[in-house]
UniProtKB/Swiss-Prot annotation:
Signal peptide: none
GO biological process: sorocarp development
InterPro entries: HssA/B-like_chaperone (IPR050533), HssA/B-related (IPR008455)
Protein name: HssA/B-like protein 28
Disulphide bridges: none
Amino acid sequence: MTILSAITSITRPNKISKSVVSSNGGASLSLSSNSVACATACGGSSYSYSSSYSSSGLGYSYNSSYSSSVGYSSSVGVVIGSCGHCS
């Protein structure tokens, strides 16, 4: 499973920042956000927050995954599938 990740600024534990998706033009955009807590503890206090975005009319969909290992360092990436931070 390929994970493209980018390190973001350090955040406090249990703080999730919301993402806003806006549409330019007349294309219809449907936004659905799912908060998924992975029950698989990959080591210590690791957890992940997953949001799913789909766009009708534009023909694409992607999953954004938020994972934190100890609650202080965070990474945001685009993954195919769900709960792929353990791989």
